[in-house]
Amino acid sequence: MRTLTLIAIVTCAALVIFHAAAAEELEAQDVIQPEDIFTGVATLEEDRIFECSFSCDIKKNGKPCKGAGEKKCSGGWRCKMNFCVKF
């Protein structure tokens, strides 16, 4: 019984991780259907909350995610959880 419970928990955890990774990949590819109004709004709000909300002084390929004193990212860079991400 304990073995089955452990297998069920591990399987559920793996599915949650796989689903989160797939959602991140789809978000990065901007795959949002027009009929997904609520999903689109949630994605915009999420981007507004996380985009450049940290100092993001990390440099990627020698280019800063955002310039000194700037509040927004430029050049296609976005700050996500204090990492520079190219979109």
UniProtKB/Swiss-Prot annotation:
GO CC entries: extracellular region
GO molecular function per UniProt: ion channel regulator activity; toxin activity
Signal sequence extent: 1-23
Cell location: Secreted
Entries under SUPFAM superfamilies matching the protein: omega toxin-like (SSF57059)
Tissue: Expressed by the venom gland.
SS bond partners: 52-65, 56-79, 73-84
Pfam families cross-referenced by the UniProt entry: Toxin_20
Family affiliation: Belongs to the neurotoxin 12 (Hwtx-2) family. 03 (juruin) subfamily.
This protein's name: U3-theraphotoxin-Cg1b
Origin species: Chilobrachys guangxiensis (Chinese earth tiger tarantula)
